[in-house]
Amino acid sequence: MTKKIYLALALSSTLIIDSLLQAEESPVSKYDPLAITLADIQWGPPGGGNGAPVGVQTARQGTDPVTGGITYYAKFPAGSHFDKHWHTHDEFVVVVQGTVTIVLGEESHSVSAGSYVVIPGKLNHSWDVPEGEEDAVIVVRRAGPADFHYLDR
């Protein structure tokens, strides 16, 4: 019986050590390291219209190689409005600067820097940035490829 216990301990120790060695050799992620500040962002040209706020600027940070979901910054000018729309995939948002009023379904929420918002796929939502305040900057992470479906069209 003692030989069986020693054999079991030796086998399990070997498996644990082997898995630790493999973990050290295996890449942790397919992503490259990235650390970026708001001041470092390379904004795209102002765009918008056709439902999106006029003057909105974006800066893509990456695309998930498995889901096709993108991560990007978006800067909305003060006084701008994003028409009611929905996306197929879930959307995760962190407000980095400014204040945004977001309507999720039928509920309105005023969120400011540091706020986190989850927008389930297919949920109608719209955005407003108050007039006379600073531009709003958000970071968006999508769970799948981006698509926009506007309601009032």
PLM feature segments, named:
Residues 28-36, 126-153:
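Double-stranded beta-helix
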Residues 70-87, 121:
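Conserved short histidine dyad/triad with adjacent acidic residue
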Residues 77-80, 87-105:
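Glycine- and acidic-residue-biased ligand/ion/polar-headgroup-sensing regions
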Residues 23-68, 153:
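A short, N-terminal "cap"/entry segment at the start of jelly-roll beta-barrel domains
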Residues 51-53, 65-67, 86, 94, ...:
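Extracellular/periplasmic catalytic domains that process cell-envelope and extracellular macromolecules
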Residues 8-18:
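Bacterial N-terminal signal peptides
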Residues 105-123:
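Short acidic-glycine-tyrosine-enriched beta hairpin
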Residues 1-9:
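Bacterial N-terminal signal peptides that target proteins for export
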